[in-house]
């Protein structure tokens, strides 16, 4: 590993960001408990793809471009906030509903879930700023293409295991049973979580 790259620092920072509660974690948890492992993995794959998109974009300086063109940040910010608010509304409606559901009745198209995960990640403007900051900490200005590729792959593989691990964890029989028993409470918590995330994105600043 090239000594100029502080890969451990990058991966530790990425780990802390991945394990902290956020839109991606909430979405994977809710989908995995309600619809099963397959659906959770499909969603996690979309979120991982989104991580690759932002990671590559950060390498090519999209964060700096956003800083120079505020309107780009604003467009992504409002789209991201609107999408999270939509997810909050769906979760709130499910929490209010007293209709009992079965796990297998919520199965959805895997490609649609992949797209949902991708949109969830690429409409969060904080992600590109996070990756830009992350790379500024551990990647030297004169890094070669090979070094940048190493970082992108390392962070991408790291994200893959974290997000897919969540899908396996929350789709376990214990978690599924718990979800069915406390579905309305879970959905209420998801609604609040997505709502708070939406408000935070609306209040996000470039500097």
Would you name each region that the model predicts?
Residues 147-171:
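Hydrophobic alpha-helical transmembrane segments of multi-pass membrane transport proteins
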Residues 120-133, 191-194:
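Core segments of transmembrane alpha-helices
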Residues 68-99, 158-162, 166, 177-207:
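Selective transmembrane alpha-helices of multi-pass membrane proteins
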Residues 15, 19, 52-53, 89, ...:
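Hydrophobic/aromatic residues within the transmembrane alpha-helices of Major Facilitator Superfamily
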Residues 5, 108-113, 122-126:
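Juxtamembrane cytosolic amphipathic helices that cap and anchor the N-termini
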Residues 8-13, 82-85, 115-119, 150, ...:
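Short alpha-helical transmembrane interface motifs in multi-pass membrane proteins
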Residues 38-113, 199:
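Membrane helix-loop-helix hairpins that form the core translocation module of multi-pass transporters
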Residues 2-74, 133-150, 154-155:
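Juxtamembrane transmembrane-helix termini in multi-pass membrane transport proteins
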């Amino acid at each position: 590993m090239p000594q100029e790259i502080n890969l451990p620092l990058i991966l530790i920072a990425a780990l802390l960001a991945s394990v902290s509660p956020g839109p991606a974690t909430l979405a994977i948890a809710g989908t995995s408990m309600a619809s099963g492992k397959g659906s959770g993995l499909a969603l996690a794959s979309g979120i991982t793809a989104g991580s690759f998109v932002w990671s590559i974009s950060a390498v090519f300086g999209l964060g700096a471009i956003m800083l120079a063109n505020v309107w780009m940040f604003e467009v992504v910010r409002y789209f991201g906030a609107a999408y999270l608010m939509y997810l909050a509304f769906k979760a709130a409606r499910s929490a209010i509903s007293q209709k009992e559901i079965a796990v297998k009745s919520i199965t959805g198209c895997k490609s649609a879930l992949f797209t949902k995960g991708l949109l969830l990640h690429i409409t969060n403007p904080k992600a590109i700023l996070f990756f830009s900051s992350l790379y500024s900490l551990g990647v030297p200005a004169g890094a070669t293409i090979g070094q940048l590729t190493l970082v992108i792959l390392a962070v991408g593989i790291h994200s893959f295991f974290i997000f897919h691990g969540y899908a396996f964890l929350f789709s376990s029989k214990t978690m599924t049973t718990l979800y069915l028993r406390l579905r309305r409470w879970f959905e209420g918590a998801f609604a609040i979580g997505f709502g708070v995330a939406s408000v935070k994105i609306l209040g996000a600043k470039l500097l």
